[in-house]
Amino acid sequence: MSELKGACIIGQSGGPTSVINASAYGVIRTALDSGCITNVYGAEHGIKGVLEDRLFDMSQEDPKELELLKYTPSSALGSCRYKMKDPDEDDTDYKRILEVFKKHDVRYFFYNGGNDSMDTCNKISKYMQKVGYECRVMGVPKTIDNDLYGTDHCPGYASAAKYIATSLMEVYQDAHVYDTGMICIVEIMGRHAGWLTAAAALATKYGAGPDLIYLPETDFDMDTFLADVQRVYKETGSCMVAVSEGIHYADGSFVSEAKTSATDGFGHAQLGGLAALLASIVKEKTGAKVRGIELSLLQRCGAHLASETDIEEAVMAGRAAVENAVAGITDKMVAFERETVDGHYVCKTKLLPLTEVANFEKKIPIEWINDSHNGVKQEFIDYVLPLIQGEPKLQKENSLPRFAKLKKVLAK
C-alpha cells in the first residue's frame, strides 16, 4: 500500500482508567516520531472535540510531561459519552467530521475506548470509505470492565483488579478488629460482566477477602443470597461479600434498578446504591451490624496501585495502532493475545476487524464460576494473576504523585 502522509487525531472516550493515558502516550509518541504523520492532534473530549474542532496540538507539549502520561490516571484529553447515529439515518455529524478532517488534513484517526467507542470507530471508518476520503481508522482498547470481545484482556482492567483486591484485603483487616461480628457488603463496578468483582477473589486467595462473590453472569436470587450470608455469619461470626453493580434477577431486571432511572448517552442504566440496598435488607433480616461500601470511582483511577504490566501493555497498544496504520492497516482494533514462553506470561498484539468488536461483550466463562454461583474457581485466578504484576514508577513531589500537566494548545 502506498505511503499516506497527513495528520492524525487521538481521542479518548468512555469511562477513564488508570492507564488510558498510557495508551494515549503510545499513540502520541509514536505518531510524533513517524515520518508519515505531519501533525498530531488530541481531540478535546473525544469525538465531541472533533465535531467542535477543538483539537490540541500535541507537538507543543513538553516531552517530559508526555512521559508522565504513562502514570497519570483518568483521561488527560477529556472524555465523552456521545452516541453517533447511523449515517444512513442522519449523516450530519459525519459530514462535520469530514469537514474537520479535511481542514486539518487528517488521514489517521485513533480512538481509545471500549465497546461503544469501537462502534464509533466503525461508523466513522465506513463513512469515510463511502465518501472516498482516505483515512485510516484504528481502535485502541480501553475498559476496566474487561468486556471487549476478541481480546484476552483490556488495558485498564488489571490495574482496577489490583486496586480492588488490595482494597478488599484492607477492608477485611478493618472489619475484623472488633469483638462483635460485622457483615460487610462491597459493591464493585460491572454492569453485564463480572471481571472486576471476580478480582476480589485475589484478596481471598492471597490474604483475606470476601467469603461470597456474586457476578452478573448468573441470575441473582435474594433468598439464596440471604441464606448464604447467614450461613457464613453463623459459622465464622462475620461475613464479607463482593457484589457486582450489575447483578440481576432471573427476569433480567437489575437488583439496584429501582434506586435510579437515570441513563447515560448510550441508554445504559446508571447503576449504583446496591451495597446500601443489600446492607439494609441483610440488617433487617439478621439484626447484625452491617456495612455497605461502594468503591465507585476510586477503583478506576487508583494510579498509585496500578499494574506496571498493565501500563506497559497500554503503551504497547497505542504504539501498535500507529505502526499498523502507517503500514497501511485500517478498520481494526488492537487486541491482546496471551502466550506462555518458558513458563512465563507473555502478551502480544493482534488486530481484530472493528465489525467483530463493536457492540459485543465478553463475559466470564461460566465454567470459571463455582456451582453455587457465589465465587470463582482457580481458572480465574490463573487468568488474572499475571496481569497485575509490577509496581508503577510514579514520580513524586513532596511524597505526592506528580501527574502530567498538559498545556493543551488548540490547533488553528
Each PLM stretch: what is its role?
Residues 1-2, 52-107, 116-117, 155, ...:
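Glycine-rich oxoanion-binding loops at beta->alpha junctions
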Residues 4-10, 69-83, 142-152, 179-182, ...:
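Gly-rich Lys/Arg/Thr-decorated short loops/hinges at beta-loop-alpha junctions or inter-strand turns
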Residues 17-27, 50-51, 93-95, 115-123, ...:
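Short glycine/serine/threonine-rich phosphate/pyrophosphate-binding segments
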Residues 100, 108-113, 119-134, 138, ...:
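Accessory alpha-helical/coil subdomains and C-terminal extensions
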